């Protein structure tokens, strides 16, 4: 009986260590030391809405591990696209953001949108896109290309 208990406990212990090791190796449990709110990237939401540039809007919370892991990528795309996009960070739990959080139907975190006030357009970027920097850049470039076509069409219609 004692031998069965020792074997069972040993197997469970090895299983737990294996799961934790796998999660850590794949970054599932790792986060950066900085909280998302400490990054201070971008401009206030109301300023982005008054701009002609589209905005990349990040909905986050400080307790969200995926939000913490995404922040270095958000910092990179801010540097790469600061001339083409405004960047906005909205804490999904802050009372002052509750209206936009409800309007955007935020159900998971982090959530990334392109808001384009000029064309009253909103594009949700899924986590399959934004967690892969190459895919995210492709999507951001695609949107800029479409926007240039819209700008050209609008200028032709005005003539």
Language model features with spans:
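Thiol-based oxidoreductase modules, predominantly thioredoxin-like and allied folds used
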Residues: 59, 78, 82-98
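Non-catalytic, surface beta->alpha helical segment in thiol-disulfide oxidoreductase systems
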Residues: 108, 113-159
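The canonical Cys-X-X-Cys-His
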Residues: 59, 64-68, 112
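N-terminal targeting signals for export/organelle localization
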Residues: 1-36, 156-159
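A short beta-strand-turn-helix
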Residues: 35-53
């Amino acid at each position: 009986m004692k031998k069965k208990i020792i074997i069972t406990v040993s197997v469970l212990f090895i299983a737990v260590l294996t799961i934790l090791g796998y999660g850590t190796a794949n970054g599932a449990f790792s986060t950066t030391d900085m909280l998302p709110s400490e990054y201070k990237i971008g401009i206030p939401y109301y300023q982005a809405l008054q701009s002609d540039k589209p905005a990349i809007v990040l909905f986050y919370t400080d307790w969200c591990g995926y939000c913490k892991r995404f922040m270095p990528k958000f910092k990179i795309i801010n540097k790469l696209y600061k001339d083409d996009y405004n960047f906005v960070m909205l804490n999904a739990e802050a009372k002052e953001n509750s209206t936009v959080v409800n309007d955007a139907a935020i159900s998971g975190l982090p959530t990334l949108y392109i808001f384009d006030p000029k064309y009253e357009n909103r594009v949700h970027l899924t986590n399959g896109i934004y967690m892969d920097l190459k895919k995210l850049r492709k999507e951001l470039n695609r949107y800029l290309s479409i926007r240039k076509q819209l700008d050209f069409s609008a200028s032709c219609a005005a003539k």
